[in-house]
A protein has these predicted regions:
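Active-site PLP attachment segment
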Residues: 161-198
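Walker B catalytic acidic pair
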Residues: 149
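Generic enzyme active-site microenvironment
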Residues: 146
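Conserved core of the PLP fold type I
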Residues: 1-142, 152-172
């Protein structure tokens, strides 16, 4: 197989990821050792040593291990506000603070069916997230938005859970959207380590 993975596998991973909700724009994939491998490649390729990666305060501990091994660290924002909704203010403040310190920012959002809370960002939440990163892009910052979709197939009907993906069409050139695809959960291929970074 080629280093990037078999073309048929990569096209299947893209098709499964988007399930008819593929955003307009350039798409490519590389095979990885599960979703964890996708996360690791993203951190290795897009995070400068010493920089911080942003995710929510409820997060999979392996994010921290990956960042530490690659010379970066995890910074968190408070996921929920007082009404148990996505904390738009905390997210925006954290993005703003990190963009004042670094030229590039990788943001990891584990959604839909966030582990461990089960929370899925709503269409309105995604609008806020994208408004926040677009504001930083206007200042010349490079933003990588990594969506960890490990549990997407447990979040509801496949087309409904992927509707947000079409919001990624037409983003500024300095916003890169990435997906950590995994066959470990929904396909029960955990030991097979089948994943892709899309």
């Amino acid at each position: 197989a080629p280093i990037s993975g078999l073309p048929e596998y990569l096209e299947a991973a893209i098709d499964i990821t988007f399930a008819g909700k593929r955003p307009a724009g350039y798409l490519a994939a590389v095979a990885t050792a599960g979703g964890t491998g996708a996360l690791r490649i993203a951190v290795d390729d897009y995070v400068e040593r010493g920089d911080q990666v942003l995710t929510s305060d409820w997060f999979w501990g392996t994010y921290n291990i990956i960042c530490q091994e690659l010379g970066s660290s995890v910074t968190t924002f408070t996921l929920f506000d007082e009404a148990n909704n996505f904390n738009h203010t905390a997210f925006s403040e954290a993005v703003d603070a990190l963009c004042k310190k670094q030229d590039s920012l990788l943001i990891i959002l584990n959604t839909p069916a966030h582990n461990p809370t089960g929370y899925s960002l709503s269409a309105e939440d995604w609008d806020h997230v994208l408004d926040t990163v677009k504001a930083q892009a206007k200042t010349g910052k490079k933003i990588q938005l990594l969506v960890d979709i490990a549990y997407i197939d447990f979040a509801g009907e496949k087309h409904a859970t992927r509707a947000f993906m079409q919001k990624f069409a037409g983003l500024p050139e300095n916003i890169l959207t990435l997906f950590a695809f995994s066959m470990s959960k929904a396909y029960t291929f955990y030991g097979q380590r089948c994943g892709a970074l899309i």
